[in-house]
Amino acid sequence: ADIFKAVKSKQLPMWRLSAGMLGASFVAMQTHVVPIAGVALFTVASLAGQTAISLWVDHVGLAGGIKSVISKRRVIAAIITVGAVVISAWDRFVMSDFSILAITLAVFAGSWVGVQRALNGQINSFSKKSFATSQLNFITGFSFLTFLLILRSLFTDHSIMNLTSGPWWMFLGGSIGVFYIAFSAVAVQYVGVLEFTLLSVGGMLIGSLLLDVFVPTEGTQISPYLITGIFLTYLGVIANGQSRFSRK
């Protein structure tokens, strides 16, 4: 209710409620680009888009928090983190998958996620309830993806029934996403979109390492590239944290 009151009073522009559509667009783009460029290249390219746009949204204060100057240290922190992901995925790159178009699309898709986080942060500053923000995000995202899915079913030979061919646990991703969006909507208001992005990258890499250790798939090996990437990621976090501390 507080969200729509803010829209009605013109404190919150209507278009900023489209955060969920940006996240849905990322998911849709991912399903098309990954088969072309591969998971590793898509991950690196989309992260590059996220970190670049995060510098801008923090600078203009789109998340509703304190505005941040695009300092050299913050740029270096972003570059270090992107480099860390490149190194962590180094042994999974397949150069035959290299496609300028696919990588460009992945960069754009990643930038949408950065803007989505900022918009969710701003929406949350009005709702004061992170799960209400998350609910709005998923309603708009689900509606948009459903629309795209219907269009695809009408104009291609892909059937919606194909969704049931995968394992049941793959549908848990959306449930986990509810908590992720709720948490990120609060966090970006305090630490900024860039620092949240850097920390979440570190978390994802650590999660990958834990899965490789405790739930390994056939042929899985603990990659020294992944471990190196984790250390470099948190070096980027430290660099960005020092930049934020120096402003105070």
Please report, for each region that a protein language model flagged, where it lies by residue.
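Glycine-/small-residue-enriched transmembrane alpha-helix faces in small-molecule transporters
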Residues: S25, M29, R73-I79, G83, ...
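Helix-helix packing/entry segments at the starts of transmembrane helices
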Residues: A40-G49, F126, S130-T140, V178-D212
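Specific transmembrane alpha-helical segments of multi-pass solute transporters/efflux pumps
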Residues: D2-L41, S46, V86-I87, S175-V191
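Membrane-interface helix-loop-helix junctions at boundaries between adjacent transmembrane segments
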Residues: H32-Q50, L55-I76
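Structural signature of hydrophobic alpha-helical transmembrane segments
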Residues: V34-A52, D97-W112, M161-G177, P224-F231
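Small-residue-rich segments of transmembrane alpha-helices in multi-pass membrane proteins
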Residues: L17-A28, R73-S88, A106, S134-F144, ...
